[in-house]
């Protein structure tokens, strides 16, 4: 492996970490940038033009520059994830393969109740934490309390290069495509593959099977 390729991979990894830190905190401090390295990566990223730095009181805060952000591809996916199953894992694994960072927006309890007419089995923070614990997922965030997950605001915050939808998310896909077209955003929309085993393709079918087994 050439030194040039290795350096690019190291820089890309630092930029991924900076993007995720900024998504969590907004402009962030060195303390919030939790990246294990013996060197001072933030100053290197600033001097290379990948990060912007500004003094905010006693602390210096950092944010990605357009140049830095352009070096990574961010994928956004979303769903309810009320009882995670292998179909979710397959879809999120495919979504992650499309880019460098996978951000997943999880529907709030209010959104689920509005969409499905019932409260979810698991509360929103539990569902968010479970999704974030999946290997393909870099970060999971809660949506906003409307039937469209608040995707107009989420697209601004996440600024994805790609939005990936499951085979059964046609309504949500139409909503997001309308937002993208209305705001003239440069975002690619991708339809993920249908999971091969119908028995485990949806949370509702899985819950039905569990109910039958327990009855």
Predicted regions and their residues:
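Nucleotidyltransferase catalytic core that binds NTPs
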Residues: 2-215
């Amino acid at each position: 492996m050439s030194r040039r390729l290795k350096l690019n991979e190291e820089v890309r990894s630092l930029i991924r970490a900076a993007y995720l830190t900024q998504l969590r905190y907004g402009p962030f401090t060195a303390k919030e940038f939790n990246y294990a390295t013996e060197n001072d990566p933030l100053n290197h990223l600033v001097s290379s033009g990948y990060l912007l730095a500004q003094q905010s009181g006693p602390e210096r805060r950092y944010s990605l520059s357009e140049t830095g952000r352009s070096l990574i591809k961010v994928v956004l996916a979303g769903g309810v994830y009320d009882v995670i199953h292998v179909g979710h894992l397959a879809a999120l694994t495919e979504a992650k393969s499309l880019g460098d960072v996978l951000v997943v927006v999880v529907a709030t309890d209010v959104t689920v109740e509005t969409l499905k007419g019932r409260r979810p089995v698991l509360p929103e923070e539990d569902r968010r934490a479970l999704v974030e614990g999946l290997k393909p997922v870099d970060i999971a965030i809660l949506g906003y309390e409307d039937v469209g997950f608040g995707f107009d605001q989420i697209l601004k915050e996440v600024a994805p290069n790609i939005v990936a939808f499951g085979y059964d998310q046609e309504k949500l896909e139409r909503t997001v495509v309308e937002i993208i077209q209305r705001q003239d955003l440069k975002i690619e929309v991708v339809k993920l593959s249908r999971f091969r085993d119908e028995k485990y393709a949806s949370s509702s079918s899985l819950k039905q099977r569990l109910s039958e087994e327990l009855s």
